[in-house]
Design a protein with these regions (language model features):
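Intrinsically disordered, low-complexity terminal regulatory regions
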Residues: 1-95, 171-173, 183-189
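Short hydrophobic/aromatic beta-strand element in the GNAT-like acyltransferase core
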Residues: 56, 101, 138, 151
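Regulatory sensory and allosteric helical modules in signal-transduction proteins
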Residues: 62-70, 78-134
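Residue-level recognition of short loop/turn positions
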Residues: 107, 144-145
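A short, aliphatic-rich beta-strand micro-motif
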Residues: 135-143
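Sensory beta-strand/linker motifs that couple input domains to effectors
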Residues: 145-156
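Regulatory loop-to-helix N-cap segments in sensory/regulatory domains
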Residues: 155-171
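Hydrophobic recognition helices of helix-based DNA-binding modules
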Residues: 177-181
């Protein structure tokens, strides 16, 4: 497998390079993750959405090819209707240049965007126009080897004052889930 890093737009790299992508892909496959939806991770995302009151919650396990939501909670009806009359539905896969999780993975720390519009770097992201995302809260899933496996995140179509309580909650949930995912290492392969 090869990983093609993103190309810069002028001098600004809008999506950070993911140097750990090949190692992460190998680690996720060893854990039996990242290739299919996981009902337990869907349930985790649902609980996270309930806890935060956000309409979207995800467990994102990106690999060399893009992002994959192994755990996903979305509203039954898309809360945004685009100007063309279509209500977009967030699926399980997104390109690397969509959304904010790739930034969490590259930074290796949580990202709080209370109003995406306040940040020029993020305001032009495709998920803002396509899904109406206006706020984001995400934290990395870091395993015991120090590798970022992915992210735990929530998003809303309204600006949200996540504040310190939101940041603390997302980081705690990410840490708990990382331990749970790592326990798969001792399980036999599928």
């Amino acid at each position: 497998m090869t990983y093609d890093p993103p190309r810069p737009a002028g001098r600004l790299l809008l999506t950070p390079e993911d140097k750990e992508a090949p190692a992460r892909t190998r680690r996720l496959r060893r854990l039996g993750l990242g290739e299919r939806p996981e009902p337990a991770l869907d349930a985790f995302a649902h609980r996270l959405a309930e806890l935060t009151g956000a309409p979207y919650a995800m467990v994102n396990l990106p690999d060399e090819h893009g992002q994959f939501y192994a755990g996903l909670f979305v509203p039954a009806v898309a809360p945004v209707v685009r100007s063309d009359g279509i209500s977009p539905r967030l699926g399980r896969a997104l390109p690397r240049d969509h959304g904010f999780c790739p930034h969490v993975v590259a930074r290796r720390k949580a990202l709080v965007l209370e109003d995406v519009g306040d940040y020029p770097r993020f305001a032009g992201n495709p998920v803002v126009d396509e899904f109406g995302i206006r706020s984001y809260l995400g934290a990395p899933l870091i395993d015991g080897t120090g590798l970022v496996l992915g992210t735990v995140s929530v998003a809303d179509i309204e600006p949200r004052p996540w504040g310190k309580p939101g940041l603390t909650a997302i980081k705690e949930h990410a840490a708990l889930l990382a331990v749970e995912l790592e326990s798969r290492d001792s399980l036999p392969p599928y």
